[in-house]
């Protein structure tokens, strides 16, 4: 990967890549490779974060963000010491790395580092902005969401939003989506905020959380016509009109269609019934061991004995102008077996600030986008919005609905992605390893580097 990272002292733009849960820098190799193919070393300096790899990702978004922030500061200092002058900053996070990157951005903002840089791109690939809590109700909620939250140490608590972050009394992800937080203020500095979300087969982070959405128009793809982005078919959907509802007579959801689908999935179901129990046991044992190790690392970190002086990161206010008080496969398969629940019609949320706006593409880049919505301004609704009016609202928590409203207030360029060749679309979206079945991820990375990345 060394041939793709780094850069020359002539480069004035630093791009930081952050891997996900259980990940390591090698997972971002093809992301770096695609960037380097588009931008030479004298134009773009590429840093792949290294200090939060493997089981260290169990330690929580906060600790991961502090580690990445330290790496960015160290890299800026190193480049400067060699005679370089970085003027621009871009950050891209994959999976949990998107959340870790957002935390690091908040720290960089609070320390004034972003005041000295032109913030260009923030990109998230399959990042669970709303956590990984499945939209479930009743007993299933207790079984999956409550149990799952306790298998990944501090990261698990934060991803399932059962934590209380410092003295705020709120989950960290909720604080990070508060328009008055340093995390949102920092994110607002970036000229372009882009996300790529898998519409199916992402067993780690499903569409509603990676796409920041209250509804799921891709729950039954037999009922819609998928519209692709010209030049990037059949992988990247057209964000302005991703799907078109099919007339009733064209819906091919008859008995024969279901029977064929079941027959095609039968080998997978049989294999799952054999290997899943063994995988779950191994996963729980590994999680218990890693949770104990993570707790020890967290204790050392909090005492300032892990190589980072946390006082430089903990002395800044989290909220602006307001008091603060106001093994992977087993996990993925468990998550994939949970079907999304929906709110009863009587509890449907208002659609005024809903995902009607989710796929709106900004027509003009703004240097300083405002964080707070202007309630008097009614945004023009896209064709994608009208197509989702009839869809039921997912059974999210009140905090998740607030997170959606807060995050959407920033303005995003959202690209739905359909990976066809492999069930493991979460890994394929960034071509996490050199497999032919992951080749569709090259289309995603190509679109990002060519069409989205501002140099």
Please provide the spans of the model-predicted regions.
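Extended, polar/charged low-complexity intrinsically disordered and coiled-coil segments in eukaryotic
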Residues: 2-7, 41, 131-133, 142-145, ...
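Short amphipathic alpha-helical segments embedded in low-complexity Lys/Glu-rich regions
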Residues: 46-54, 82-90, 213, 298-302
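Serine-dependent carboxylesterase/thioesterase catalytic core
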Residues: 19, 65-171, 191
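Short, surface-exposed "cap/lid" segments of acyl-processing enzymes
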Residues: 2-54
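Acidic, Ser/Thr-rich intrinsically disordered and amphipathic helical segments
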Residues: 13-16, 26-30, 34, 63, ...
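Eukaryotic intrinsically disordered and solvent-exposed regulatory patches
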Residues: 1-4, 21, 34, 75-79, ...
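Surface-exposed beta-strand-to-loop junctions
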Residues: 7-15, 43-52, 81-84, 123-125, ...
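Short coil/turn segments at secondary-structure boundaries
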Residues: 26-33, 58-64, 103-107, 134-140, ...
């Amino acid at each position: 990967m060394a041939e793709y990272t780094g850069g020359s002292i002539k480069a004035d733009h630093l791009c930081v890549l952050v891997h996900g849960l259980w990940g390591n820098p090698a997972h971002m190799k093809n992301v770096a490779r695609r960037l380097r193919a588009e931008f030479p070393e004298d134009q773009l300096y590429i840093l792949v974060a290294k200090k939060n790899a493997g089981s260290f990702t169990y330690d929580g978004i906060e600790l991961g963000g502090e580690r990445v922030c330290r790496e960015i500061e160290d890299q800026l200092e190193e480049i400067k010491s060699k005679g370089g002058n970085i003027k621009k900053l871009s950050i891209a996070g994959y999976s949990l790395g998107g959340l870790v990157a957002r935390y690091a951005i908040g720290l960089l903002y609070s320390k004034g580092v972003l005041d000295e840089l032109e913030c260009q791109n923030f990109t998230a690939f399959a990042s669970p902005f709303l956590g990984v809590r499945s939209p479930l109700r009743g007993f299933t909620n207790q079984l999956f969401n409550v149990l799952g939250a306790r298998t990944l140490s501090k990261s698990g608590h934060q991803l399932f939003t059962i934590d209380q972050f410092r003295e705020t009394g709120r989950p960290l992800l909720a604080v990070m989506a508060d328009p008055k937080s340093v995390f949102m203020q920092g994110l607002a500095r970036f000229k372009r905020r882009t996300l790529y979300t898998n519409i199916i087969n992402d067993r780690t982070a499903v569409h509603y959380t990676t796409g920041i959405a209250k509804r799921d128009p891709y729950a039954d793809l037999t009922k819609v016509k998928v519209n692709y982005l010209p030049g990037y078919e059949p992988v990247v959907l057209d964000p302005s009109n991703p799907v078109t509802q099919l007339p009733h007579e064209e819906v091919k959801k008859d008995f024969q269609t279901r029977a064929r689908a079941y027959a095609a999935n039968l080998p997978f179901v049989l294999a799952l019934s054999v290997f899943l129990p063994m995988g779950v046991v191994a996963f729980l044992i590994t999680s218990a061991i890693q949770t104990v190790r993570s707790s020890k690392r967290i204790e050392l970190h909090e005492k300032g004995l892990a190589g980072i002086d946390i006082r430089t990161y903990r002395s800044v206010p989290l909220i602006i102008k307001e008091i603060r008080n106001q093994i992977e496969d087993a996990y993925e398969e468990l998550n994939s077996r949970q079907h999304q629940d929906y709110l009863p019609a009587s509890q449907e949320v208002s659609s005024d600030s809903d995902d009607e706006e989710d796929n709106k593409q900004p027509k003009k880049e703004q240097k300083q986008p405002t964080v707070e919505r202007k309630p008097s301004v009614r945004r023009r609704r896209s064709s994608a919005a009208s197509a989702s009016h009839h869809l039921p609202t997912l059974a999210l928590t009140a905090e998740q609905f607030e997170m959606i409203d807060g995050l959407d207030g920033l303005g995003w360029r959202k690209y739905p992605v359909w990976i066809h060749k492999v069930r493991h679309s979460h890994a394929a979206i960034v071509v996490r390893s050199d497999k032919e079945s992951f080749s569709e991820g090259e289309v995603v990375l190509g679109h990002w580097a060519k069409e989205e990345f501002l140099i």
